[in-house]
Regions:
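N-terminal amphipathic/basic-hydrophobic helices that include classical n-h-c signal peptides
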Residues: 1-8, 252-258
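Amphipathic alpha-helical repeat scaffolds
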Residues: 37, 114-122, 230-236
């Protein structure tokens, strides 16, 4: 069936709305956020996100079936896009209402992660390893920041991101909590329960003392270099190593139990 096209030029108000949504204040007030790129837009649509408007070139339009589109030229699209090389589409989606937090399985928690690229990568990490719940302190970067959305490569559409007073949640949490530090137990010799929370801290300062005080244990990725001079790992890289180790051990255990 043909797509339902709308053919008209972009107005100043349309351009302004997309530009304003780069600011957290306007995203919070409107409940909207911007997604760029064909792949990501399609994934948000398939995940059931409500699209307020999709600006698409004619080369992209056939991929979206019955979605209501605003067909634009590549020149117009470049006015909307923040990318150096705009990718066929820019969409405005409505932020979903989050469900309650399910306290089971491996949960990743972020304590004041500031860099949008790191947050987007950690969201992709959760998606890759099947972690459905990502907890963020209220000081952590906004997951609907266009840079975070772009870095997540569509994975934000499949991961439940919850913002909350992290310490307050951990006080009442029924799961054991492990914080990643530079002076914890060796990650590779630690046995983790199937259900637990792993906390990653701020890029410069690590996990806050308030959150660290609530942990059941602290873990660290040991350095293997002879000189032992590397100061630290990027938080997204560290998160990948930790989650991969935990999931790998769990996979080995399930295979042994077969």
């Amino acid at each position: 069936m043909p797509c339902n096209y709308l053919f008209y030029m972009l107005s100043k108000n349309q351009l302004k709305l997309v530009q304003k949504l780069s600011q957290k204040k306007h995203r919070s007030e409107t409940g909207l956020f911007v997604v760029e790129g064909k792949k990501s837009i399609v994934e948000f649509v398939e995940a059931g996100y409500k699209a307020e408007v999709i600006y698409a070139t004619d080369t992209f339009s056939a991929s979206l079936g019955q979605q209501r589109l605003t067909l634009v030229s590549k020149e117009e699209l470049s006015k909307l896009s923040t990318l150096k090389h705009p990718d066929e589409g820019v969409a405005i989606f409505r932020q979903p209402k989050r469900k309650g937090i399910l306290q089971e399985g491996l949960i990743l928690a972020l304590d004041n992660i500031q860099d949008p690229g790191n947050l987007g990568t950690l969201i992709r990490l959760c998606d890759w390893f099947g972690i459905e719940t990502l907890l963020c302190s209220e000081q952590t970067a906004d997951c609907y920041n266009p840079k975070v959305v772009q870095a997540s490569m569509g994975s934000l559409s499949r991961v439940e991101v919850h913002y909350l007073p992290l310490a307050g949640f951990l006080v009442t949490c029924d799961l054991p909590v492990y914080v990643a530090t530079l002076a914890g137990e060796n990650l590779y010799t630690t046995t983790f329960p199937e259900d637990c929370v792993i906390v990653l801290g701020n890029e410069a300062n690590g996990v806050s003392p308030e959150v660290a005080a609530l942990a059941n244990g602290a873990i660290t990725i040991p350095r293997f270099g002879k000189r032992q001079q590397a100061e630290s790992l990027n938080v997204a890289m560290a998160g990948g190593i930790i989650v991969s180790q935990i999931k790998g051990k769990a996979s080995e255990g399930s295979q042994l139990g077969m």
